[in-house]
Amino acid sequence: GVLFQNSKSTIDPKKYTEKIFNEFLKIKGKFKKEKIYNIINDKNKLKLLTKDNYIKDFDKVIICAGAQSGFLSKLFGDFFDIVSERGYHLMYQNYGNIIKRPIGIGKQGFYYTPMDDGLRAAGTVEIGSNNKQINHSRIKWMEKRVKETFDVKDLPNKVWLGFRPTLPDSLPVIGESKINSNVIYNFGHQHLGLTLASYSAEIVKKIIYSEKLDKEIDLINPRRFDS
């Protein structure tokens, strides 16, 4: 086995992101949850069309919607071969102290992580769509592996399915749309969304304010897939 020392982790990603979100609100950021049906490219403004045909004008739009980003980019006229890596996690509420650090077992294809609310067994990959239907045979297989690894007699108290947005080269898309430079893409981070979040935000900030970018940005430029 291999032990990675001095690494960083979080025992509750949801609480971590909620704290960041609350800081955003404290500096007078605004949040509104609405479904967008179209993005209209105007000369001076970007117009977002909502369910009630209400049009909102913006100077810049950042498309950062995970596995749904491909749908939004198509509305604007940019097409990316983005798919979902469907991944599962099982939470065992009474077993959070059974290990002290994340443990990955290669032949199983998932990690065990001690969390605030229990032991999480998470991972595996199903390449497909954003279909929310759970593959119960996959759940049963994971439950069996957990029992083989630990002295766990209970069934998981929570089962969750998530969608990892993935592109053909396994790298994210971060950069300006080729159709309108005021549309900025930031998606496709697959398994590394939380890990790369702050670095990706720094890149987006530099793009917005026309600051100098590192040469490595070419590796994640949206235009790299142009034929």
Report each predicted region and the residues it spans.
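Hydrophobic/aromatic beta-strand patches that form the interior of the parallel beta-sheet core
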Residues: 32, 62, 184-186
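General beta-strand recognition
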Residues: 47-49, 120, 184-185
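Helical element adjacent to the flavin cofactor pocket in flavoenzyme catalytic cores
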Residues: 2-56, 60
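Mid-domain beta-loop-alpha active-site segment that forms a flexible
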Residues: 3-22, 67-68, 138-145, 193, ...
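Active-site catalytic microenvironments for nucleophilic, acid-base chemistry
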Residues: 23, 27, 71, 75, ...
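Active-site substrate-recognition segment that forms the wall
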Residues: 56-181
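Short, conserved active-site loop motifs that form the nucleotide-linked donor/cofactor pocket
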Residues: 28-30, 119, 183
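C-terminal catalytic lobe of FAD-dependent flavoproteins
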Residues: 7, 13, 148-227
